[in-house]
């Protein structure tokens, strides 16, 4: 993406002389808010729009220890209404699977120091270890490469090709950057091609949402709001993200409007949308909240 395009997105007030100021986002209506219980510390819900199904990464075990290499993690295949279709859909031995990204029949999921890729049709999987990573958190795929965040040590990694399922392929793993004061957690590919990152730093230090342009420059899209986790951009250009500090899922508009869509979470993690439905896992409560929106 060209720097000029990024400027128009990030600084609409400065660009007002040559472009119209974005409209204030009309609030969404939450038509229903349903809670589905019984999950084993769910960290991410991946929405497979092509096959109208969900995949939920879970830590398993008696405690939600995100760094334990205990082989207790798994991914469930779940219907849009929250009913579990297959509790352990993939047979691979995972530890603490976290962020999920889905494209076609490929599913990527992070797992402490590794990135898995699966074929959702055949269930075949392959794991690659990411040298130097401390806490592989979220993953997205853009232009044939996978990007993995590490919010513990403030790093972003690239793995290419992203589709390395075949054993004959040896993916190239690159440290894109480190120590940029982003502490990237949730990732998303924006409509303009930039890479969006939700900041999460512990102890309780607030961050916002950031955009990385094709040239690697990073800009702030929002002020410092909280400790952010899941992230997505809606078709209308507004952002959805979860915040551990406020225990909420939030919609952020082009003029800085903040709309709380749901609150009362103890561990709001990696969200996704399927049509007008928003899915938000609560890692601490072991639940998934399902919000039906008006649009």
What are these regions (language model features)?
Residues 1-7:
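Bacterial N-terminal signal peptides that target proteins for export
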Residues 16-17:
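C-terminal motif of bacterial Sec signal peptides marking the signal peptidase cleavage site
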Residues 29-36, 83-90, 124-129, 171-178, ...:
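A short beta-strand motif characteristic of beta-propeller blades
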Residues 35-71:
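Beta-strand-rich domains and repeat architectures in extracellular enzymes and scaffolds
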Residues 39-51, 91-106, 112, 131-147, ...:
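Beta-rich, blade/repeat-based domains predominating
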Residues 67-76, 114-116, 155-158, 208-210, ...:
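A short loop-to-beta-strand structural motif that recurs across blades of beta-propeller domains
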Residues 78-83, 119-123, 160-165, 212-217, ...:
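Short loop/turn segments that connect beta-strands within beta-propeller blades
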Residues 79, 212-215, 235-238, 251-259, ...:
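Flexible "stalk/tail and boundary" regions
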């Amino acid at each position: 993406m060209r720097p000029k395009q990024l400027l128009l997105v990030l600084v609409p007030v400065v660009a007002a002389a040559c472009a119209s100021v974005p409209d204030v986002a009309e609030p969404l209506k939450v038509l229903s808010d349903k809670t589905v219980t019984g999950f084993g510390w769910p960290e991410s819900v991946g929405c497979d729009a092509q096959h109208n199904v969900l995949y939920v990464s879970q830590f398993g075990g008696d405690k939600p220890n995100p760094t334990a290499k205990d082989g207790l993690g798994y991914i469930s295949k779940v219907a849009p209404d929250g009913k579990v279709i297959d509790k352990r859909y993939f047979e691979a031995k995972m530890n603490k699977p976290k962020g999920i990204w889905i494209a076609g029949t490929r599913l990527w999921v992070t797992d402490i120091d590794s990135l898995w890729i699966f074929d959702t049709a055949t269930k075949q999987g392959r794991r690659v270890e990411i040298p130097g990573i401390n806490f592989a958190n979220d993953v997205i795929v853009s232009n044939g490469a996978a990007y993995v965040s590490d919010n513990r040590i403030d790093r972003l990694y690239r793995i290419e090709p992203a589709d390395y399922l075949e054993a004959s392929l040896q993916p190239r793993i690159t440290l894109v950057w480190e120590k940029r004061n982003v502490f990237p957690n949730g990732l998303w590919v924006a409509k303009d091609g930039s890479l969006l990152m939700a900041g999460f730093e512990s102890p309780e230090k607030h961050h916002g949402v950031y955009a990385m342009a094709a040239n690697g420059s990073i800009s702030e899209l929002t002020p410092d709001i909280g400790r952010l986790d899941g992230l997505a951009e809606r078709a209308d250009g507004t952002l959805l993200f979860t915040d551990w500090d406020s225990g909420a899922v939030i919609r952020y508009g082009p003029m800085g409007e903040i709309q709380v869509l749901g609150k009362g979470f103890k561990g709001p993690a990696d969200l996704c949308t399927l049509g007008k439905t928003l899915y938000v896992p609560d890692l601490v409560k072991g639940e998934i909240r399902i919000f039906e929106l008006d649009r």
